[in-house]
Amino acid sequence: VLSPADKTNLKAAWHKLGGHGGEYGAEALERMFATFPTTKTYFPHFDLSHGSAQVQGHGEKVADALLHAVGNLDDLPGALSALSDLHAHKLRVDPVNFKLLSHCLLVTLAAHHPAEFTPAVHASLDKFLATVSTVLTSKYR
């Protein structure tokens, strides 16, 4: 459960991303593809080369979904229900991949905002991404 301090940290962290969410989302995807090559199997129709328009576009989708989640911290299951259905029933993404992408997002955010990436912010972001992952995999059961 996200505490009031976590919610404050998350909103502040997302505010600092400014217009870079899509850029960071794409960078996190590229990190994931490089570090965990098996994740590429879910994107057979994508050009997965550095800076590809398809990876950039999907990075934007990831960032938009997380921004939507941050705006609905008190109802993450409701806010992410359609996305959970999509990943569980249509795309059939292995749930472990959400954890892998979450890790790559944390690394990307820490690399770009080291001063703001305090232990408290890190813990709040980690808890948030774990909660989002849990919600996204809830329809698998």
UniProtKB/Swiss-Prot annotation:
Task: Give the signal peptide, or none.
Answer: none
Please give a single GO biological process term from the UniProt record.
hydrogen peroxide catabolic process
Q: Which CDD domains match?
A: Hb-alpha-like
- Residues where N6-succinyllysine occurs? K7, K11, K16, K40
Residues binding heme b, per UniProt: H87
Record-linked InterPro entries: Globin, Globin-like_sf, Globin/Proto, Hemoglobin_a-typ, Hemoglobin_oxygen_transport, Hemoglobin_pi
Q: Does the keyword Heme apply?
A: yes
Q: Which domain of life is it from?
A: Eukaryota
Disulfide bond positions: none
Q: Report keywords, A-Z.
A: Acetylation, Heme, Iron, Metal-binding, Oxygen transport, Phosphoprotein, Transport
Q: Name one GO cellular component term.
A: blood microparticle
Residue(s) carrying N6-acetyllysine:
K16
Question: What's one GO MF term for it?
Answer: oxygen binding
List residues modified as Phosphoserine: S3, S49, S102, S124, S138
User: Per UniProt, where does O2 bind?
Assistant: H58
PTM-bearing positions, type Phosphothreonine: T8, T108, T134, T137
Q: Which SUPFAM superfamilies match?
A: Globin-like
In UniProt terms, what function does this protein have?
Involved in oxygen transport from the lung to the various peripheral tissues.
Q: Which family does it belong to?
A: Belongs to the globin family.
Q: How does it assemble?
A: Heterotetramer of two alpha chains and two beta chains.
Instruction: Write the protein's name.
Output: Hemoglobin subunit alpha
Q: Which organism is it from?
A: Tamias striatus (Eastern chipmunk)
